[in-house]
């Protein structure tokens, strides 16, 4: 709907780049939802999307572009690092923000107008350790995680703490940087030894 009475929703997320699978899925879902709601008549919505490429600076630019187009509701960003930047702006500008998939625990701390739909990183780490302990999935655990990624590191930290509390033995922890995601042979070999 292009009506001036339509509620303007801004969405930002990675629509290109390595994390695009997340952003494009959210964009497609939002486009379908807006189309279905608008087809029923009554309250109308207008959706504008911006690519943040999972980059904090580009997320800030996307937010400002959407705000400049009259955005009233922020749907996104989609990933945690951009969410932290945009949440601070939304809190300051008093714009309602709802992230469908930003999972960092700090996101909602920016203001009472910032909301998350999905589970947080700490919850994922704790739940994983609890599941492994409850289902007796192994007495010795190796952990391999992306040390350059807030999401991966956040899950690892909470997993390690909960695993220790549950008496699980983490015998190997190997991290890899962002530039080495395609070959984890070294990390797997170290954990196997």
Predicted region positions:
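Short hydrophobic/charged patches on amphipathic alpha-helices used for structural packing
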Residues: 60-63, 129, 185-189
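Conserved hydrophobic residues forming the short capping helix/wall of the S-adenosyl-L-methionine
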Residues: 34-38, 160-163
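Immediate post-signal peptide segment of exported/extracytoplasmic ligand-binding proteins
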Residues: 1-13, 39-44, 133-140
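Short, high-confidence coil segments that cap the C-terminus of an alpha-helix
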Residues: 70-71, 137-138, 193
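Short beta-strand segments enriched in small/hydrophobic residues
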Residues: 5-27, 77-78, 140-146
């Amino acid at each position: 709907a292009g009506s001036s009475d339509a509620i303007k929703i801004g969405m930002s997320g990675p629509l290109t780049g390595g994390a695009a699978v997340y952003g494009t899925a959210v964009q497609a879902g939002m486009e379908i939802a807006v189309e279905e709601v608008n087809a029923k008549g009554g309250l109308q919505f207008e959706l504008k999307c911006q690519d943040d490429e999972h980059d904090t600076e580009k997320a800030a630019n996307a937010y400002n572009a959407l705000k400049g187009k009259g955005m009233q509701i922020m749907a996104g960003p989609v990933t945690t690092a951009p969410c932290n930047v945009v949440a601070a702006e939304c809190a300051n500008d008093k714009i309602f923000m709802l992230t469908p998939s930003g999972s960092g625990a700090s996101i909602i701390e920016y203001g009472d107008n910032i909301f998350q739909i999905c589970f947080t990183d700490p919850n994922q780490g704790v739940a994983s350790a609890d599941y492994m302990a409850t289902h007796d999935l192994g007495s010795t655990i190796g952990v391999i995680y992306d040390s350059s990624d807030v999401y991966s590191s956040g899950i690892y930290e909470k997993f390690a703490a909960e695993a220790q509390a549950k008496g699980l033995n983490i015998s190997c922890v190997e991290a890899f940087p962002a530039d080495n995601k395609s070959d984890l042979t070294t990390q797997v070999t170290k954990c196997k030894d």
